[in-house]
């Protein structure tokens, strides 16, 4: 009987070990499998799983179990497996367990971002900690077109045309400052009006997850033109003011004066703006409803200005060697071009709320602005009985400042863009935006005009004395653009 009990205990121990090979190990309230060595499992070809239990039952407890619940010895102890008695193995179902972890969803490229679930449990993740491809809106290629309604900083114009009441002494006619002189054109800014324009954007993602890409853009504003024209048959006073460098006093050139001259004066200021660039796009963080991208690349920007002043005069009476009927054509031209080339770095962010979205873009470009300044002038004299003659120089453009000038300076160009829109379809959206752009060290045509004139340089220039004025005195200023835009974007 004693031998039978011992065999029963051995059989029970073997069965328990065999069942435990498929059960976790119990530590308090946690079970875990532990590899047993081959030495601990005689007759086994490879290590098996054994059971280790904290607070395991004692030999006495095992004997009590064997005494109360004897088990006949099977023919092959090692081949039969029976479940362990409930008194030995605890109820696994009663132990605490870790909640199952939801697997990361697999998303095929091109799946609409709004339909992608996130690990946070919603359609839109609250933070940028999880990036489930593809990030952002669908489509690997995008292109957009925007109508621009922007205004640029106008160029400053000095007083170009003045008038005085009839009867004003010839030496004071059109002279500034004078209580009887009014400015007809100039003395303020020109080309600061809102103008229409167009901007084209496009890009492509280089990977299926929309994390790396290339984008490019180009824009232009329609040319701004500010024109002025006046004329008189000699019944009114029209003048062009300047500062006499010989006398050190304000002075004026007559365009029309009763009994002396009849003439016309036209002045035109023009301005144009174009720009563009190419950027690499590197995603910093994203979730199905928002993304933040790093931008770095190349930026180009051009601002061009021109001022053209023309006079057509006819002498009404002879003055010295000038017979009556002599005609004059006087031209002054000032032109500037600014070509900025630089490297740009910035951020682009977008957040989506269902079918609506908002975005912001900020960047700064550092580089070189090449300033090109051209000053030209000519005077043509056509006597009534004689050959026409042409002279270099007009009034404000004289041999002392006429020329082609080139200079390169360091410049900074920050840019800010905001937009909000609606996702019309999965592949199309419309939006409205606001844009601001700044460029430092810009040469404007109006700033290159020097009102100091040495009258001895005026044609026919028989004897030149005194200072070489007007002079080339380059000036630079700040340039800004701001305005609104409406656009449509397509993705493929």
Locate predicted features:
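Cleavable N-terminal export/targeting peptides
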Residues: 1-131
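Intrinsically disordered, low-complexity segments enriched in small/polar residues
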Residues: 6, 12, 26, 41, ...
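Small/flexible residues
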Residues: 6-7, 34, 55, 65, ...
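Outer-membrane beta-barrel transmembrane strands
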Residues: 24, 85, 89-90, 95-158, ...
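Solvent-exposed loop segments that connect transmembrane elements
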Residues: 161-183, 236-258, 310-333, 374-404, ...
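A short acidic (Asp/Glu
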Residues: 372-374, 443
């Amino acid at each position: 009987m004693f031998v039978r009990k011992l065999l029963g205990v051995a059989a029970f121990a073997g069965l328990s070990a065999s069942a435990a090979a498929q059960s976790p190990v119990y530590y308090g309230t946690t079970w875990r499998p532990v590899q047993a060595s081959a030495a601990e499992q005689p007759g086994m070809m490879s290590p098996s799983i054994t059971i280790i239990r904290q607070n395991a039952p004692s030999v006495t407890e095992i004997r009590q179990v064997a005494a109360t619940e004897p088990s006949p010895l099977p023919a092959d102890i090692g081949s039969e497996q029976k479940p362990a008695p409930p008194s030995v193995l605890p109820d696994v179902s009663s132990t605490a367990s870790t909640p199952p972890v939801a697997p990361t969803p697999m998303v095929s490229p091109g799946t609409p971002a709004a339909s992608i679930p996130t690990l946070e449990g919603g359609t839109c993740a609250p933070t940028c900690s999880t990036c489930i491809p593809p990030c952002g809106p669908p489509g690997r290629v995008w292109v957009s077109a925007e109508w621009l309604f922007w205004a640029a900083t106008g160029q400053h114009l000095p007083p170009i045309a003045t008038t005085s009441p009839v009867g004003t002494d010839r030496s004071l006619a059109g002279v500034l400052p004078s209580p009887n002189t009014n400015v007809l054109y100039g003395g303020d800014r020109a080309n600061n009006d809102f103008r229409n324009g167009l901007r084209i954007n496009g890009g492509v993602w280089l990977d299926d997850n929309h994390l790396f890409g290339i984008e490019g853009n180009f824009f232009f504003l329609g040319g701004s033109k500010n024109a002025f024209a006046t004329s008189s048959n000699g019944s009114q006073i029209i003048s062009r003011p300047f500062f006499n460098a010989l006398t050190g006093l304000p002075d004026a050139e007559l365009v029309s004066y009763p009994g002396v001259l009849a003439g016309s004066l036209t002045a035109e200021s023009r301005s144009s703006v174009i720009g563009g660039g190419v950027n690499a796009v590197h995603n910093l963080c994203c979730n199905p409803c928002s993304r933040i991208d790093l931008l770095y690349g190349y930026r180009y920007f051009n601002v061009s200005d021109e001022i053209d002043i023309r006079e057509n005069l006819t002498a009404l009476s002879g003055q010295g060697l000038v017979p009556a009927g002599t005609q004059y054509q006087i031209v002054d031209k000032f032109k500037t071009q600014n070509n900025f080339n630089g490297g740009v770095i910035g951020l682009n962010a977008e957040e989506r709320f269902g079918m609506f979205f908002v975005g912001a873009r900020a960047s700064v470009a550092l580089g070189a602005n090449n300033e090109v300044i051209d000053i030209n002038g000519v005077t043509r004299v056509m006597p009534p009985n004689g050959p026409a003659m042409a002279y270099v120089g007009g009034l404000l453009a004289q041999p002392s400042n006429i020329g082609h000038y080139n200079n390169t300076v360091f410049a900074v160009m920050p840019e800010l863009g905001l937009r909000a829109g609606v996702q019309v379809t999965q592949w199309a959206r419309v939006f409205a935006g606001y844009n601001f752009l700044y460029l430092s060290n810009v040469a404007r045509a109006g700033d290159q005009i020097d009102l100091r004139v040495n009258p001895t340089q005026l044609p026919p220039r028989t004897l030149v004395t005194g200072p070489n004025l007007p002079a080339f005195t380059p000036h630079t200023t700040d340039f800004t653009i701001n305005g609104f835009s409406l656009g449509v974007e397509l993705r493929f």
